[in-house]
Amino acid sequence: YKGWNDLYFFRKYEFHIGSIRAGEQIRMLTSGFLHVDMSHLLFNMLTLYFFAPVVIGFLGTFSFVLVYFGSLVFGSLLTMSFHKNDYSYRAVGASGAVTGVLYSAILLQPDMMLGLFFVIPIPAYLFGILYLLYSIYGMKAQNDNIGHTAHFGGAVGGYVITLVKEPQLLVEHTLMVILLAIPIVLLFILE
């Protein structure tokens, strides 16, 4: 709420490449607590509401917090890397962290069904793959005001942290682990 009514506060804590490169790395975390408006915040929190219980149920509360904040950092680091020469690049939102939780939930429960456009039921693993392919497109096109790079980095964070916490997934869901890794590998090949 404060960020919506206090531009100085908003600018002080947003993700800003120039400021981060000047030593204000704390912005890589604080930006995750700022949102452009109420709909931005509500969409992130609604996604968290649906997928956090899956992660908490499988990994526990502490590991959920680790996935959340780890994904926020992964999203910020990938954004830093991708936009490193654009000193004016700015971003806010918990989308990287939330996408990490989403990808963790998909990895933990790949057979759950999700609604594409909230209507068409598709398997979670397929949604995860399509979502990251769309994120790659958005990162390359750079024609909207969406933090695709943070989303992608957050998903990578959720994927990696979940596999570190639950390495047996490599055996139990080998095919899903490989399928969900395809867009991640694809991005780094395209770079």
Regions found by a protein language model. Name each.
Residues 1-191:
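A detector for small-residue-rich transmembrane helices and their helix-helix packing motifs
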